[in-house]
């Protein structure tokens, strides 16, 4: 299961609501190519906003610029990464390959998820039609796992949630049986994405 925004914390109801508002509204803004300010997303309570941002930052679930703009949240990133989504409205970068496949699956849109095999560097393109991924022969995703809660989503989870061109290349990279995780098919990744991004609604 994808790490939840609150799986390692117990914020107050007000702070939890602010966290979700930042994540969902920030997601839609980034999808549209904007980097909104925290004040735009957080509502009127400055204390709740400050606590919500601290909660997200401490857990690696948001990136904020020095002047207070949201540069990444809920899987989307304004900065260039190795993973991106090409869709009819443009393109957007993501934190990991799982995001690149799972988000358009959740939105039910036509898109191409672009990433690269970490072992050989070969480009991998997953085509989705109305949110349904087409097959990509041999490609599998590594889903990192941990015994406890993730303390930093991007550094600990997203850095390892990669798509590989083959199971052999996955094993070369992570080491067969030496790392904790699950091998997933592209269809399984899409289904997980529908669950993880159910909160962003339908098409943006």
Language-model segments: which ranges?
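Short cysteine-rich clusters marking metal-coordination/redox-active sites
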Residues: 117-120
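Short alpha-helical segments that sit at the start of domains
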Residues: 1-24
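Short, cationic-aromatic polyanion-contact patches
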Residues: 12-19, 66-88, 130, 139-141
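Short acidic, hydrophobic short linear motifs in intrinsically disordered regions
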Residues: 26, 30-45
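Short, amphipathic alpha-helical interaction segments positioned at domain boundaries
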Residues: 72-110
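A short, conserved structural fragment
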Residues: 57-68
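Short amphipathic alpha-helical interaction segments
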Residues: 42-58
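Long, low-complexity, charge-rich intrinsically disordered regions
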Residues: 109-112, 123-204
């Amino acid at each position: 299961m994808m790490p939840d925004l609150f799986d390692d914390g117990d914020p107050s109801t007000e702070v939890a609501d602010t966290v979700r508002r930042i994540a969902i509204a920030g997601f839609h803004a980034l999808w549209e190519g904007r980097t909104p300010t925290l004040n735009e997303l957080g509502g009127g309570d400055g204390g709740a906003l400050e606590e919500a941002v601290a909660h997200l930052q401490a857990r690696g679930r948001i990136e904020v610029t020095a002047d207070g703009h949201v540069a990444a949240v809920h899987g989307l990133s304004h900065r260039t990464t190795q993973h991106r989504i090409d869709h009819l409205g443009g393109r957007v970068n993501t934190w990991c390959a799982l995001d690149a496949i799972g988000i358009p699956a959740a939105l039910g849109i036509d898109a191409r998820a672009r990433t690269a095999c970490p072992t050989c560097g070969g480009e991998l393109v997953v085509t989705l039609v109305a949110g349904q991924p087409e097959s990509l022969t041999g490609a599998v995703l590594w889903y990192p796992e941990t015994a406890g809660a993730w303390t930093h989503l991007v550094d600990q989870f997203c850095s390892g949630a990669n798509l590989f061109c083959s199971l052999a290349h996955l094993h070369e990279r992570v080491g067969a049986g030496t790392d904790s995780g699950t091998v997933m098919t592209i269809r399984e990744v899409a289904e997980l994405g529908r669950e993880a991004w159910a909160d962003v609604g339908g098409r943006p």
